[in-house]
Amino acid sequence: MEKQFELLYHDLERNHWWFNSRRKQVIDMAKPKKGEKILDVGCASGLLLEDLTKIGMSAAQLNGIDVSDEAILKCHQKGFKNTYVMDGADIQLPLESFDLLIASDCLEHIENDEKALNNWYSLLKKGGRIVVFVPAFMSLWSPHDEVNYHFRRYTNNELVEKAKMAGFKIQRKGYWNFFLFLPIWLVRKLKNLAGGEKLSPEEMDSDLKPAPAPVNAVLKLILSLEKFLLKAIDLPVGVSTYFVGTK
């Protein structure tokens, strides 16, 4: 992604409603266990790794990779030494060595996503688990995707079919951020109609910006309610889509 947005995200990701709620949802679906060897693909500055330590995981069992030198430096500064600068489609770590692999908003940045999924499959132990979140629906495509260097957005069927082709057994699939889907869709459509799709790279902007504290709190509350609902049901649409699988 553009460097200016990477730096902004590093500042935002701890408390911003989107990043904060997504980490909680991912952890809830991943069900990590003490002693498991865990890999976070696209670990950024290590906030998910931090959250995992807060629920009993040790830094020694946590691993991460990211394409950003600066992100991995931040991980090292936080004490996560098993973090490396690597390409998410060609992770050079021991095969069949991880119990759990998490990739939240990473696969869409990789041009050859099928190669990446095959690579991730090879890294998991037999019976190992994977949780993947990606942006949903090309109808939501906007300058936000451009500045973040996304290659695509997915339907759940597209994501699941590619996961199955790599060999994963699907345990759960669906969408996340259901309640905010329509407002976000409308905002992006209006931006595109206003000429957002014709902006130069210098004029494009990301949707993720600091939110006023009351707004941030309300949006976190909405996604907390959704997390509760997702314990019992799957949702038909959302801003993101996911699958949970096993090897």
Model regions: which residues?
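Conserved N-terminal segment of class I S-adenosyl-L-methionine
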Residues: 1-96, 100-104, 117, 212, ...
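A C-terminal cap/extension of S-adenosyl-L-methionine-dependent methyltransferases
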Residues: 2, 180-247
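Short, glycine-/aromatic-enriched active-site segment of Class I SAM-dependent methyltransferases
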Residues: 9-11, 130-152, 156-162
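A structural helix-start
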Residues: 69, 110-114, 134
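A short His-aromatic
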Residues: 105-109
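A short glycine-rich, Lys/Arg-flanked "PGG" loop and its adjoining helix->strand segment in the class I
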Residues: 114-129
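Conserved S-adenosyl-L-methionine
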Residues: 168-178
